[in-house]
Amino acid sequence: EIVNTDAMQVYRGMDIGTAKLPPAQRRGIPHHLLDTLSVREPATVAQFQGWARAVVSQLRERGTVPVLVGGSALYTRAVLDRFEFPGTDEVVRARWEAELAAVGPAELHRRLAERDPEAAGRMLPENGRRTVRALEVIEITGEPYSASLPALEYADPPTVQIGLDIDRPTLDLRIEQRVEEMFDEGLVAEVERLFDEGLAEGRTASRAIGYREVTAYLSGDLSLAEARERTVFATRRFARRQYGWTSKDPRIVWIPYDDPQLLDRALAVVGSCA
């Protein structure tokens, strides 16, 4: 059974902009951690780790193989690897949230880069939520945020990871095509509908790539063409950073995306670890 590890596909109604697999294409296979939260609800990596590990444990207990599909490299690592989360401090968090609102995500990311360049290099400058969390951890622990990131050690050893390798020009083109398809398929209407469900109040969902750009368009801050262009740019940058995460993991078996024997090779990798 499938276990989603995409940070934004957990939200109900965020379908087009997250490229969520439609129910008709799931072929009757159970998919877990899709459409779990309303767009108003915040979600953290620590919460997601608990949810996903509980699902994996339940599947294991009944002899079903969990297939994690993502998505978000940090979320996947949090589920697979030994990863203990630092505590939280609501007062410290609130102060950094207020600073984020006052100076914006780019300036806050610059400050993080001064304190912990490694952590800053792993997250997008516009991801204010993660920057706030990193600064909170640094202040609470007195240590770099990067020191709290997961080690390359499986929490559940019988695990195999497979990645699809693709050249950057092809990936960039596919991202541009996918963004165009999302807008053509009704991303703007989806965001308008989600506004009625509280997207603007959602601390996590409102910051998703594509949704924040469309929000800027609907508020008159961007033209539609600019919203498309910025979504393409942000997605490409996100993809590069995700690749930066995964390329450093020697446990991942990479298979060319256009390999005619892709499925057979993937099954062989899984079989060799059984």
Kindly give the residue locations of the regions a language model identified:
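Phosphate/pyrophosphate-binding catalytic cores of soluble transferases and nucleic-acid-acting enzymes
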Residues: 1-274
